């Protein structure tokens, strides 16, 4: 049975005005919990021949903050009041999965503790300076040699090839499919922007209004 998603938001804010409210500063920090998110259920085995139906299966927590500063004033231009405002703002937020039925924490599905936008990958410790250093490298990275166009034979490594880090210490570079057993992979980045910026200018004079806004991330 499907139900409505529930959103619970907690926040604390501060608004300050200076110079007869010509200069205004505001700040807001928040935590937003989304319960019973509607999304696809766990990935089904291929023999089912169909994708998992959408269900209320996940909870998500978003933490963030926003800040802005605004300057507004007016003066007389050609015997008419000229009003203007300049505003700049910045914000940041991150979201983590707090509930999802994925005890094995497979990377093909959401898992508890996952930050949205996570990018998993290998860690590289520079490159081999000499052929001798490459030949003497004790870690078998034949699995990832295709990424650097190296041969699997005798590790196929030469000076200038990338040196992958053996994170689990078993002398072999391996791929993971689960956050419970990371093998030689880890979170190396995020596809979502951290900081969002906005800027705006508005003005009106003699019945003429102008507005400019821009956003960036």
Language model features with spans:
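Membrane-embedded beta-barrel scaffold of Gram-negative outer-membrane proteins
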Residues: 4-48, 91
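Flexible, solvent-exposed coil segments and beta strand-coil junctions
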Residues: 41-52, 174-182
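Extended amphipathic secondary-structure runs
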Residues: 186-211
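Conserved small-residue
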Residues: 58, 65, 74-189
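Outer-membrane beta-barrel signature, preferentially recognizing the C-terminal barrel domain
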Residues: 1-24, 52-79, 115-130, 190-195
């Amino acid at each position: 049975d499907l139900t409505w998603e529930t959103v619970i938001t907690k926040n604390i804010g501060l608004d300050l005005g200076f110079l007869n409210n010509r200069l205004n500063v505001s700040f807001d920090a928040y935590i937003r919990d989304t319960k019973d998110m509607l999304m696809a259920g766990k990935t089904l085995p291929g023999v089912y021949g169909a994708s998992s139906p959408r269900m209320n299966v996940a909870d998500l927590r978003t933490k963030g903050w926003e800040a802005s500063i605004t300057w507004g004033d007016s003066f007389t231009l050609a015997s008419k009041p000229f009003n203007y405002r300049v505003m700049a703002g910045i914000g940041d937020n991150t979201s983590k999965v707090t509930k999802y039925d994925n005890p094995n924490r497979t990377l093909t599905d959401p898992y508890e503790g996952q930050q949205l936008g996570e990018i998993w990958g290998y860690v590289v410790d520079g490159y081999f300076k000499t052929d001798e250093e490459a030949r003497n490298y004790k870690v078998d990275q034949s699995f990832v040699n295709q990424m650097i166009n190296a041969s699997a034979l005798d590790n196929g490594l030469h000076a200038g090839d990338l040196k992958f880090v053996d994170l689990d210490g078993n002398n072999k570079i391996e791929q993971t499919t689960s956050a419970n057993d990371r093998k030689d992979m880890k979170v190396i980045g995020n596809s979502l922007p951290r900081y969002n910026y906005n800027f705006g200018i508005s003005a009106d004079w003699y019945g003429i209004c102008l507005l400019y806004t821009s956003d960036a991330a």
